[in-house]
Amino acid sequence: METTKPSFQDVLEFVRLYRRKNKLQREIQDVEKKIRDNQKRVLLLDNLSDYIKPGMSVEAIQGIIASMKSDYEDRVDDYIIKNAELSKERRDISKKLKVMGEAKVEG
């Protein structure tokens, strides 16, 4: 069996991928936090909507609350999609790193 030393470029690529993987993990955690925060806002607006009655205030308040709720729900959906994209990229990088590591062990 022939042993091949990893080239400097291979090492740089491995380090770059490893750093990207770690960055993606941090971004995923950040996005998950944003999802939780926005879900809490949706719940808050639901509760607030229960307390505001048409006779208590202007009807426009109900419309504003509904609009805000919709905006927060849209944000939650956007963050869920972004999180899925980041997770996919992280998994792809993990697979690449594994292959690169196995190639070096076999080489």
Swiss-Prot record:
Transmembrane segments: none annotated. It comes from the Bacteria. It is found in: Cytoplasm. One of its GO terms (cellular component) is cytosol. Residues 14-41 form a coiled coil. Pfam families: DUF496. Keywords: Coiled coil, Cytoplasm. The keyword Transcription does not apply. HAMAP family: Pole_loc_TmaR. Belongs to the pole-localizer TmaR family. Pole-localizer protein involved in the regulation of several cellular processes. PANTHER family: UPF0265 PROTEIN YEEX. This is Pole-localizer protein TmaR. It comes from Klebsiella pneumoniae subsp. pneumoniae (strain ATCC 700721 / MGH 78578). The lineage of its organism: Bacteria, Pseudomonadati, Pseudomonadota, Gammaproteobacteria, Enterobacterales.
